């Protein structure tokens, strides 16, 4: 009996994880002057409080995930540096 309850709870937990996809919010900005491009983060570890490192035309910024697709997560990588990008 206990194993059946555990199996059902486990299945419900996995199902809720699959159905609750999270995304970076879509940026309202479509373009940015090169002199204004700034990276506040390069990877999710650079952000705090459950926020993600999301890419925008003006650089990478820590944003809280949303359930609406459209945004883009920052790719990071060795060439990514925080601060202004010239």
From Swiss-Prot:
Residues 21-66 form the WAP domain. Keywords: Antibiotic, Antimicrobial, Disulfide bond, Secreted, Signal, Toxin. GO terms for cellular component: extracellular region. The keyword Signal applies. Contains 5 disulfide bonds. GO terms for molecular function: toxin activity. Disulfide bonds join 24-54, 32-58, 41-53, 42-80, 47-62. Has antibacterial activity. Belongs to the venom protein 11 family. 01 (wap-1) subfamily. This is U15-lycotoxin-Ls1d. It comes from Lycosa singoriensis (Wolf spider).
């Amino acid at each position: 009996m206990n194993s059946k309850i555990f199996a059902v709870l486990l299945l419900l937990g996995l199902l809720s994880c699959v159905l609750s996809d999270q995304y970076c919010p879509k940026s309202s900005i479509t373009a940015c002057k090169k002199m204004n491009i700034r990276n506040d983060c390069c990877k999710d570890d650079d952000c705090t409080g459950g926020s993600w490192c999301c890419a925008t035309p003006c650089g990478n910024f820590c944003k809280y995930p949303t359930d609406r697709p459209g945004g883009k997560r920052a790719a990071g990588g060795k060439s990514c540096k925080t601060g202004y990008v010239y």
